[in-house]
Amino acid sequence: FFVFMGKTEEFCCPEIQTHILHDKMIMKKEKTYSRAPLPFVGQKRMFVSEFKKILKHFDDKTIFVDLFGGSGLLSHITKRERPDAVVIYNDHDNYRERLENIDRTNTLLRDLRKIVGIYPRHQKITGKMREAFLERIRLEETTGFVDYLTLSTSLLFSGKYAQNMEELEGLYFYNKIRQSDYRCDGYLDGLEVVCYDYKELADTYGVFPGVVFLVDPPYMGTDISTYKMDWKLADYLDVLLVLKGHPFVYFTSGKSPILDFCRWMEEHPGIGNPFKGAGRSTLTARMNYNSSYTDIMLYKDLPRAA
């Protein structure tokens, strides 16, 4: 059974850093991960089985481009299922940095387990124990890297995430500390790992006849606070442009109105933009000292008949 293993080269420029794993054929059957090695909000672990089936529809394709790579799970599964294909993992969230520091994360969690001792699982951590936790985490931050997203799953209430020390200090702690080390052996092997704007990547590879785009953007209408991006409606719609004329696998959510919007536009193709040329007035309303919203009024008169 042939699989691809990788050696690493890095190419750096002021704005873009790429990390390419060059293919090297060896005789070894590697582990296939069914979930990302480190926690990642929105990874497609529940879709793994179905995704493998869908990949069989693209047996004639030779290049798979994971435009919104996230945790890299889709890229990893694709390479394991199609070792003959080129798989591009666009690591826009720098998940690779978290993997490279997995030993530091494991050491930090082991130290926190020693501090917590036999304290009951899932109980709130307060007082001197909480301060000891914070002191150990601060020490780690001064000497290197802290994976706050992974740390959050061991300390915070389910669904809560901190992205820095300041956010972590403001949240309640619970004894949910993972009892074993994280492992990521071979997870990125065989992948070409890059970091580009997805539009640039789509333009580069869209000219190849054997390409398939794997498209898992942030979901419209859902929490995207853990992503390293801030999206508006136009950004979600821009993603649809890369789908036109290319084979693709696209992911969205039942909470997202994007499919309803596309269906409506198909049923009303001639409407255009009803707000084109309209006047606009805005009003900012403040709910409290740190929360406000903006109301918008649009107005447009029709030409009077002669």
Where do the language-model regions lie?
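Hydrophobic alpha-helical signal peptides and transmembrane signal-/tail-anchor segments
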Residues: 1-4
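Active-site segment flanking the S-adenosylmethionine/decSAM binding pocket
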Residues: 194-236
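S-adenosyl-L-methionine
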Residues: 13-59, 73
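Conserved hydrolase catalytic core segment
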Residues: 80-84
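Well-ordered, non-membrane alpha-helical segments in soluble/globular domains
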Residues: 173-179, 229-240
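Conserved proline-anchored active-site loop of SAM-dependent methyltransferases
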Residues: 65-78, 89-93, 153-158, 207-223
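Long, positively charged, glycine-interspersed low-complexity recognition regions
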Residues: 236-306
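Class I S-adenosyl-L-methionine-dependent methyltransferase module
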Residues: 86-188, 301-306
